[in-house]
Amino acid sequence: VSRGGTFVLVIGESETRNHMQVYGYERETTPWMKDQRENKENIPFSNAYANYTHTVPALTYALSEKNQYNDMDLQEAYSIVEVANVAGYETYWISNQRKFGVYATPVSETASTAQHQEWMNGMFADSEEKENHDDILLPQIPQSCEKNALIIIHLMGCHADYRDRYPDPYFSGEDATVDAYDDAVRYNDYILSQIYERVHALPNFKGMIYFSDHGEDPDRRLYHEATKFTWPMARIPLAMWFSEDFQADRPETIARLKSHEQAYWTNDLIYDVMIDVLGIEGLPHMEPQHDLASTEYEITKENAMTLHGTVRLADEDSAAAK
């Protein structure tokens, strides 16, 4: 197994597949991602879901061994950053979200183990919030890395207030809230294109993975409130890019990922696929049945869950709120 190189994990915010052109939405909200379908480095996934509809519970599971399907104690679960550190990766956490606040603590704990940290939106929840657009993150991406690096980039993405997320309006229709959300999705697509351009130029680039923490329901103004759960809050994008040399070194991994493009997957399992992609072996606890790049992957629509194990994905089709 090829190990090492530079890998990038981009975490989106509040982006639902329902408003993404690349997933069939009628507006041109994701022109870059749509074009990427022609890029041989790109592997798109159709059926990704959030494990929860709020950032901290969602990312606490996503970035650690803990998931909806195991009975692991969260306090004992390793995080992807801790494991990457031990495996000899230089770790970076670059964020446009605040570091400390009532809601950010477990995610901040994970981020705090990264060797290099850049927080572009201040430290504390009660400090003056800066409405920095996500392009502020671009200059923070290292221009050269050690031989092995894991760069995690946490976007503000499509978080409400949507109008604060992008510089210039693009869409105008009958619903100003939806227009603003679609503008945020379109700007997010631009940001992803710029991140990809930068990291792809790194001499040792191997792969980039993008997923959103959870979705959003702007149409009903429900945002991502778990107590008013609707399926757009759970439907998220997942896409991966792997360099030609990674694909040449790891053809089986690529073949297995491609065979799972239509598979059902929840983002509490990003940890498992990242461990595989990073080439990390010999951990005390591994779950190949939850690894999207494994032949043993066994999550299906029938056994997949969201809202931390309280809602079954199998119920999506019968839900009144599509």
Q: What are these model-predicted stretches?
A:
Residues 1-9, 14-169, 266-267, 272-298:
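Active-site-proximal alpha/beta segments of enzymes that process anionic O-linked groups
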Residues 254-259, 278-315:
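Polar, surface-exposed loop/tail segments
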Residues 189-193, 197, 241, 271-275, ...:
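Marks the mature luminal ectodomains of secretory-pathway proteins
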Residues 93-95, 150-157, 182-185, 207-212, ...:
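Short beta-strand segments
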Residues 8-9, 187-226, 271-275:
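Metal-dependent active-site segment of extracytoplasmic phospho-/sulfohydrolases and closely related
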Residues 71-78, 174-186, 226-234, 247-274, ...:
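A short beta-strand-to-alpha-helix junction
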Residues 100-105, 155-202, 227-237, 244-246, ...:
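Active-site-proximal cap/lid insertion segments
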